[in-house]
């Protein structure tokens, strides 16, 4: 379910302020954020934002195709390492 159109997209105020300040100064540095729920705005294109995945910050370079999506979509929180392998040791225990 999406957000109501009358409310508009959400972006963390501090994160958006940092982006706007960096655009005015012409700086490009990594910004750490825990706000996975923030929507990517056109002002963010070209910046690298490190999004927290619950364990570490995953650096994400923002491109035009990402505008309108959430930051959390690009930093997965779960890592699937595969099911157990069928080895001699595991079958011998039965």
UniProtKB/Swiss-Prot annotation:
GO terms for biological process: ribosomal small subunit assembly; translation. It comes from Moorella thermoacetica (strain ATCC 39073 / JCM 9320). GO terms for molecular function: rRNA binding; structural constituent of ribosome. Protein S19 forms a complex with S13 that binds strongly to the 16S ribosomal RNA. Belongs to the universal ribosomal protein uS19 family. One of its GO terms (cellular component) is cytoplasm. This is Small ribosomal subunit protein uS19. The keyword RNA-binding applies. Gene3D superfamilies: 30s Ribosomal Protein S19, Chain A (3.30.860.10).
